[in-house]
């Protein structure tokens, strides 16, 4: 997934396409484009940027489909910087919906029906909260 859906991979694809002549408000920034700038351009309605974000959602959905068919987690939580604004952003909402739709198209129907894909709600504190939860559990075991 890192090769296709990470911030650096998205920026590299954007740079390649912009240098090849893609029509976007980001054209002048081809050499220095970032995933954050792609999100900002998409938020301004840049059609090319939205398309690249959709493509990224499809790549992520392929990875999610593979993982879900392997371990059947029931819940897939997306977090980190590559959520294009998350649930608070129309671009983030579009990104999530595209992932869900692409996942459903690629999955067995019964697997898709039993799987929820959503954004993480804990934000940047998720790691700390998880570590605290593990510490608490281990402490309680020692009593």
Question: What is each residue range found by the language model?
Answer:
Residues 1-143:
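ATP-binding/phosphotransfer module of carbohydrate and carboxylate kinases, centering on a glycine-rich
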């Amino acid at each position: 997934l890192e090769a296709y859906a990470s911030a650096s991979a998205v920026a590299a694809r954007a740079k390649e396409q912009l240098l090849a002549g893609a029509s976007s408000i980001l054209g002048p920034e081809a050499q220095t484009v970032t995933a954050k700038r792609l999100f900002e351009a998409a938020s301004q309605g840049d059609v090319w940027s939205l398309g690249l974000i959709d493509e990224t959602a499809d790549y992520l959905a392929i990875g999610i489909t593979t993982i879900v068919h392997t371990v059947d987690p029931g819940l897939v939580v997306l977090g980190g910087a590559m959520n294009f604004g998350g649930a608070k952003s129309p671009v983030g909402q579009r990104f999530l919906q595209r992932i869900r739709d692409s996942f459903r198209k690629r999955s067995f129907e019964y697997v898709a029906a039993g799987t929820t894909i959503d954004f993480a709600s804990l934000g940047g504190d998720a790691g700390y909260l998880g570590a605290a939860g593990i510490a608490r559990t281990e402490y309680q075991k020692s009593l």
